[in-house]
Regions:
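Structured mid-to-C-terminal alpha-helical surface segments
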Residues: 2-8, 13-223
Length: 223
């Protein structure tokens, strides 16, 4: 999963929009259309997950059409920037997409701005270790798949992940660093479904052991 966060800034910089501004500008862009595509934005509101007030992710669905006919629906989740995540935005070249666009006669896509991978990893470590409460059960088994794939392409240091993670856990204040991954009921089936066709550990048990070893290595790392 590629993440593009939002900060609490204002208009003028595409990387520093509020959730409301992003929604309004996204809806306007869909109405205006691009290369035969257009769409309508449906706002589904905040996602019910444990998070400090003002930092819960927001779910939008873009219902797309192409040249007047139905094309598909894309789910977009946005969240405010945390712990300096936008200080250094990373860009991913859209190489595969560029080939597809060329075959379809569409304009060449620009590089995709993303949340730095160290921040994405820290957020997923936080998400899959967040304790349950009376109103919410942690179902984030899929993060164990995402983490394996992310670590495979991550080129930074474990110390960088630790720095981000410590600040993130402190800012959110939901549970302490370092955490432990604990499997919940239903995780085994969810992990198996998410892992289909991917080069990741075959069982949930293996993935939990791997994730907790990773957490120990990150916590022991130093700059």
């Amino acid at each position: 999963m590629t993440m593009w966060p939002l900060s609490c800034g204002g208009r003028g910089d595409p990387h520093t929009a509020t959730v409301d501004e992003f929604r309004d500008e996204f809806a306007a862009a869909l109405r205006a259309g691009w290369a035969g595509f257009a769409g309508v934005l449906v706002d589904e509101g905040e996602i019910a997950v444990p998070a400090p007030d003002g930092y819960r992710p927001h779910r939008l669905r873009a219902k797309l059409e192409y040249r007047g006919g139905p094309f598909g629906t894309v789910t977009v989740e946005v969240a405010p920037e945390e712990v300096g995540g936008l200080t250094r935005v990373e860009e991913i070249p859209a190489r595969d997409a560029a080939d597809w666009f060329a075959e379809l006669g569409l304009p060449t896509p620009q590089p995709v701005p993303t949340l730095p991978l160290a921040h994405q990893i820290a957020q997923k470590l936080h998400a899959c270790t967040t304790p349950d409460d009376r109103a919410w059960v942690n179902e984030r088994a899929h993060d164990l798949v995402d983490l394996q794939l992310a670590l495979r392409v991550y080129t930074g240091s474990l110390a960088e992940i630790r720095d981000v993670a410590v600040r993130l856990f402190t800012a959110r204040g939901l549970h302490a660093w370092p955490p432990l991954v604990t499997a919940r009921q239903g995780w085994k089936a969810r992990y198996a479904a998410e892992a289909v066709g991917l080069d990741v550990l075959p069982t949930l048990e293996d993935a939990v052991i791997w994730a907790n070893q990773l957490l120990a290595e990150i916590n022991a790392s130093e700059e």
